[in-house]
Regions:
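C-lobe/activation-segment region of protein kinase-like
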Residues: 151-242
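Soluble, non-transmembrane catalytic domains of enzymes that act on hydrophobic metabolites at membranes
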Residues: 1, 55, 128, 145-146, ...
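Short acidic, glycine/proline-rich loop/turn micro-motifs
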Residues: 35-41, 103-107, 162-165
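Conserved protein kinase catalytic/activation segment
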Residues: 141-152
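Short, glycine/acidic-enriched loop or turn micro-motifs at the edges of active sites
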Residues: 97, 139, 157
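Conserved ATP-binding subdomain of kinase catalytic cores across diverse folds
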Residues: 2-98, 129
Length: 242
């Protein structure tokens, strides 16, 4: 069992194994004393971020409060070690029955690529319109129904405040979407054309030079969580080749 059993990995996620339920559960094993103490006390790290468990809980709750297209938050829980500290953290959301993630859809049906890209860009815009910046929005974090609008998952790396560097932030988001596996299924030129159309439609006033500076790097280089934070907060990015 995902809840009762000993996890085989640090993070495990799966539909809850119950015929009567339609829930999805994530379990994280807290692997250090500092992390257990922070989560138990609800404290942030020195850099201002929370551990994954709390980040996703807080962000999912706030996204739902704003009416964002994300799964319903059902609840959360934890187990304790013999010392009384939090050992495992559980997050339970509504299972998106009838949905498939965008990466799986493209992998199984490459001719669906254009639809996946369009739906993902529309979702990105919807989140921005609600003041939500999802900094890990790749195809597998876009859940697509047979009919209707997409939903976003994995909300742990999000911002809910305005940025002074919207162009740079968008440059990362669009570039990252290409870098994280989509490049395998579309030429860079074709993807660039779809991004250009999306900018005209959704973000016509964005500064194109500032956008392009980050976009060209994000398409080809891995950018970690803290560097993404720098982009959002300061518009700062440097290529590894600089």
């Amino acid at each position: 069992m995902l809840i009762d059993g000993k996890p085989t990995a640090k993070r495990v996620s799966a539909p809850l194994g119950c015929d009567e339920s339609a829930y999805f559960i994530k379990r994280e094993r807290l692997d250090s004393l500092k992390k257990k103490w922070r989560v138990q006390r609800g404290r942030a790290k020195r850099n201002g971020t929370y551990d994954w468990s709390l980040e996703e809980l807080l962000n999912t709750r706030e996204a739902r409060r704003r009416g964002a297209p994300v799964p319903d938050l059902v609840g959360y829980g934890y187990s304790r070690s013999k010392l009384g500290l939090v050992q495992d953290f559980f997050l339970i959301t509504r299972l998106l029955t009838g949905h498939v993630d965008g990466f799986k859809k493209v992998r199984n049906a490459p001719d669906s690529l254009e639809r996946v890209i369009r739906a993902s860009f529309e979702l990105l815009h919807t989140l921005h319109s609600l003041g939500i910046t999802h900094m890990d929005l790749w195809a597998a974090n876009v859940m697509l129904p047979e009919q209707g609008s997409a939903q976003a998952i994995d909300m742990e790396n999000c911002f809910f405040t305005p940025t002074d560097y919207l162009a740079e932030t968008l440059g990362f988001q669009f570039g990252f979407f290409y870098f994280r596996e989509i490049y395998r299924y579309v030429t860079e030129a074709a993807y660039d054309a779809q991004v250009a159309q999306a900018l005209v439609r959704y973000f016509p006033d964005v500064d194109r030079d500032s956008f392009a500076r980050v976009y060209e790097i994000a398409k080809h280089e891995e950018i970690g969580r803290m560097k993404r934070r720098e982009i959002f907060q300061n518009g700062a990015i440097a290529s590894r080749w600089d």
